[in-house]
């Protein structure tokens, strides 16, 4: 859980330094919805913090008369001119409401929708209000404005931020662009334009301690540990020997458009404070956040959209909101589930929910918390939620920041990020202390990497569906809607006004307040809202005062395109089958001005260095990785001075096979020592699939990814099963104690020993045991039993044991046995006569069959393929009599002639099995019934339907039914 901590009380300075102050009139409910939309539009430019120590910013303001006109030849382009601060600011604006879903709805809790519709949205549909663009043609500038009820919003130009809003006397009037036939309009409506420059002060973001110790089976594992492949293409040196074609996965490492369908919730404190302007205010905040997530520095195509806004008018009908931020988050996460449709096809289904409140939130130590969210929960319906404290337009920063946590981003100063960010400053959105936002790269390399890895590992599948009817987000800059005075009121209360300070124009908002009975200026070190006027023809954009005429240079979106593939990187292993990568960047060109990010494969990978590794005392590669942690395990378990780690396979979920789960030898505790094994590590002992970036991908027995080659029953890669023979037997015993059943020689493959208890009994007093060649016991020796399923690693061979308490006690192994083992049965008490069956396969001898050694001999060729894959087939081979020179002969003894045919594929074929009929779908009239259809192997395992004979597939597994005629 990530609590967000601001700067505390903010920074103060004597009022004598602030010059003449004009107190803004109260700006109430008719504007608040509009304000909320603008605030949302600015979220991507804000952070989750609110107080810091830093130098003051420069800030001043002027009264201006905005002039709007349609651009000639461009029906959708609107030109806004502002004369302020001794310059002309020309804004070239385009409608921009992409953050609103077409099917966006506004709902209320505690009042009827009909009675509140007009109160919440007196201006009707707000989607047409919002615009974005550039200032004075500067491609590095940015603007986000609303042109409804006057000009409101913010813009950024050349290091200065501008915020514009109607002067209080005209706050409820409406300013709209002229019709296309009219060249311009300039109604005599004064606006307050504020300009601000950001200082070097920082905003602090506190987090709970992030555990990175090994995670036990009873603990909760962190999801934000970095992966192993680099952000940039590595150098080709030591790349390893590539093997086979490049493996390009269908879903892994693919840049796909993601749509974050969002529900915005405002509690009663928000409704009381913002009144009818609440909806617009929320959407303004969200539109700013949406623009941040469109920035190419996030290295993904992520669109934030609103599908629903819910306003709570009766406190008791909403989630319990208290000063305890963590408890409020838990309450909200639990409460919001009732408002979400379980079907992703529902237009009102949302992927994440955000609660906005005016309640002062507190963390575990201070009340400087501005927001809270869990990490990496975006597709978890129960935990994909955030809580935001609304303290003004800067709440947009908090929203972008908290959504970053939901997308699995840690803070930039977390140790996970050290290898990515290096000596990183605090100028990115996920910084724990923000000094100044780098608008050219709002997301740090670590943030981009963490969200990319998170999505590549399948944690964002709920974001793949494009919303049907998103609500349009406002395009107006927030500073055009809310002047500096109003921004101060949002942050410090209704009595606060803007403190003019030429040194902090656009960069830091200073507001009046009282301290010790004295009138002072105070700040929370956030810039003026974009769009706040900072001079004649200028306004604030991204903390800088820019000319409005430069808007044209960055108003046109530039869509990104992929650059060339880079060189192949280093192989993850020096032998035994590793993985190497090549990457490409979305830099040809880099997307700009809200242009689309590249879609398609960003990473390719392939197998490399597949040669056998030198013998390492029979240890597997996973064993080596577990043992590498022995020297770091200083904690004692019981009386043991240190811990020896061995791989754990039994009981590990299939989705966790590529985590390094190791067991403390002789103790039984197991932990996830690493979130991912090294690329190329086999997923399990009985599979040739390998791990790639924490995911199990198919590979052949030749260690090549996507290869179809398999081991046959003889353990030969790509073989046909003709080089070995099956050895089996059944043993019974009645004497107490340990008794040998069979000694399985080295080289045996596909070993299976089964001990079935009598029907209705879980144990009959007899148990399997394994003894090594040196007489030591590997399993169930010295009358000590292992009751649970486990994996036994012996000389590089993994033996899987079911546990003595299983109804079918079983020992299995698939790889060739390195040393002989003796299978025993332990009889205790008055045990019933056990029935134990064993099977394994051994390589055939290849000596020639000689009839007359000195003159001629029978010469045989390899067995051909079996005529069937199951159900009893035949194999043939050529058997010829030849002399010592290899010529055909007839002197061979016929009585010793080897057989030229033999039966094969003696295992029963997979069979179809149908289940019982389901109840009729209707209680009367004509309905239908169905039954399950499965393809089963000879031992009862479920196979894919393709494994069974399609000609024998039952045809009637769905049928009509009539229980009774309807009356």
From Swiss-Prot:
Q: Which cofactor does it need?
A: Zn(2+)
Q: What does the record say about how the cofactor binds?
A: Binds 1 zinc ion per subunit.
TSP type-1 domain residues are 559-614, 854-910, 911-967
- InterPro entries of this UniProt entry? ADAM_Cys-rich, ADAMTS/ADAMTS-like, ADAMTS_ADAMTS-like, ADAMTS_CR_2, ADAMTS_CR_3, ADAMTS_spacer1, MetalloPept_cat_dom_sf, Pept_M12B_ADAM-TS1
Propeptide, residue positions: 55-252
E.C. numbers: 3.4.24.-
Q: Which cysteines are joined by disulfide bonds?
A: 333-385, 362-367, 379-462, 417-446, 488-511, 499-521, 506-540, 534-545, 571-608, 575-613, 586-598
What does the entry list as the binding residues for Ca(2+) 1?
261, 344, 351, 462, 465
GO BP annotations of the record are: cellular response to parathyroid hormone stimulus; cellular response to prostaglandin E stimulus; cellular response to vitamin D; extracellular matrix organization; heart trabecula formation; kidney development; negative regulation of angiogenesis; ovulation from ovarian follicle
Polar residues bias: start-end ranges: 213-227
What's one Pfam family the UniProt record gives for this protein?
TSP1_ADAMTS
Tell me, using the record's free text, what induces this protein: Down-regulated in endothelial cells derived from cirrhotic liver.
Q: Which Gene3D superfamilies match?
A: 2.60.120.830, 3.40.1620.60, Collagenase (Catalytic Domain) (3.40.390.10), Thrombospondin type-1 (TSP1) repeat (2.20.100.10)
Q: How is it modified after translation?
A: The precursor is cleaved by a furin endopeptidase.
Mind naming one GO cellular-component term on file for this protein?
cytoplasmic vesicle
Q: Mainly resides where?
A: secreted
Single GO molecular function: metalloendopeptidase activity
- What does the comment on domains in this protein's record state? The spacer domain and the TSP type-1 domains are important for a tight interaction with the extracellular matrix. The conserved cysteine present in the cysteine-switch motif binds the catalytic zinc ion, thus inhibiting the enzyme. The dissociation of the cysteine from the zinc ion upon the activation-peptide release activates the enzyme.
Q: Which PANTHER family match?
A: A DISINTEGRIN AND METALLOPROTEINASE WITH THROMBOSPONDIN MOTIFS 1, ADAMTS A DISINTEGRIN AND METALLOPROTEASE WITH THROMBOSPONDIN MOTIFS PROTEASE
Protein's UniProt name: A disintegrin and metalloproteinase with thrombospondin motifs 1
